């Protein structure tokens, strides 16, 4: 089991650490590396890809520049997308500067929670997640304003939808890799059969 982390911008090392820990908790060892993905060749052999937070217009440009747009769209593994990654996964982002992947049929509102200084943490309830509420870190996060075509809503706040999944993909408006709670990483891996 190899997990790739899109390493163009954002909290790459935090995702690597979280997925490494989640794989170990699920019984995988060094034979299951978590690697940085910077070009299409890096995706070879990956069963999953994390698209971290960062700045969605910048990540979008870098995905195009590095020739990753089509390989990610065609990727057969699961995608775990956080914050800006959630924006890239949507079909409708409302910003022509973002070349979204369109892998989840949903509309997002970029930076719905405001500016950087308005970032916050909150305990949210995630549908089907055992162990009580999930402590979520929101940093200029998006919200999903409309989920369509089988996109399952997992969590909401008063601003809107903040967690969704469909099939092998999960998209979150917050940063689970920053809080130390691996339950969403583990759920994602379990959904992939790991």
Curated annotation (Swiss-Prot):
GO cellular component: cytosol; glutaminase complex
Lyase found in the keyword field: yes
SUPFAM superfamilies: Class I glutamine amidotransferase-like
Keywords associated with the record: Glutamine amidotransferase, Hydrolase, Lyase, Pyridoxal phosphate
Gene Ontology biological-process annotations: glutamine catabolic process; pyridoxal phosphate biosynthetic process; pyridoxine metabolic process
Pathway assignment: Cofactor biosynthesis; pyridoxal 5'-phosphate biosynthesis
Catalytic residues as annotated in Swiss-Prot or TrEMBL: 83, 175, 177
GO molecular function: glutaminase activity; pyridoxal 5'-phosphate synthase (glutamine hydrolysing) activity
EC code(s) of this entry: 4.3.3.6, 3.5.1.2
Positions bound to L-glutamine: 54-56, 110, 139-140
Name under which the protein is recorded: Pyridoxal 5'-phosphate synthase subunit PdxT
Description of how the protein assembles with itself and partners: In the presence of PdxS, forms a dodecamer of heterodimers. Only shows activity in the heterodimer.
InterPro entries, per database record: Class_I_gatase-like, PdxT/SNO, PdxT/SNO_CS
Organism: Methanoregula boonei (strain DSM 21154 / JCM 14090 / 6A8)
Reactions performed catalytically: aldehydo-D-ribose 5-phosphate + D-glyceraldehyde 3-phosphate + L-glutamine = pyridoxal 5'-phosphate + L-glutamate + phosphate + 3 H2O + H(+); L-glutamine + H2O = L-glutamate + NH4(+)
Functional note: Catalyzes the hydrolysis of glutamine to glutamate and ammonia as part of the biosynthesis of pyridoxal 5'-phosphate. The resulting ammonia molecule is channeled to the active site of PdxS.
Family the entry assigns: Belongs to the glutaminase PdxT/SNO family.
Keyword flag Lyase: yes
Gene3D superfamilies (alphabetical): 3.40.50.880
């Amino acid at each position: 089991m190899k997990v790739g982390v899109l390493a163009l911008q954002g909290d790459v090392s935090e995702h690597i650490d979280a997925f490494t820990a989640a794989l170990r908790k699920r019984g995988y060892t060094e034979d299951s590396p978590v690697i940085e993905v910077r070009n299409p060749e890096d995706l070879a052999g990956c069963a999953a890809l994390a698209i971290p937070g960062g700045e969605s217009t910048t990540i979008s440009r870098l995905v195009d520049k590095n020739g990753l747009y089509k390989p990610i769209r065609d990727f057969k593994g699961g995608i775990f997308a956080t914050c800006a990654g959630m924006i890239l996964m949507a079909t409708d982002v409302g910003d022509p500067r973002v070349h979204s992947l369109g892998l989840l049929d949903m509309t997002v509102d970029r930076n719905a929670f405001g500016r950087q200084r308005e970032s916050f943490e909150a305990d949210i309830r995630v549908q089907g997640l055992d162990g009580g509420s999930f402590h979520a870190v929101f940093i200029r996060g998006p919200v999903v304003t409309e989920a369509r075509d089988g996109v399952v809503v997992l969590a909401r706040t008063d601003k809107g939808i903040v967690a969704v999944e469909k099939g092998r993909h999960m998209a979150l408006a917050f940063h689970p890799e920053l809080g130390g709670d691996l339950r969403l990483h583990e759920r994602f891996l379990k959904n992939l059969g790991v």
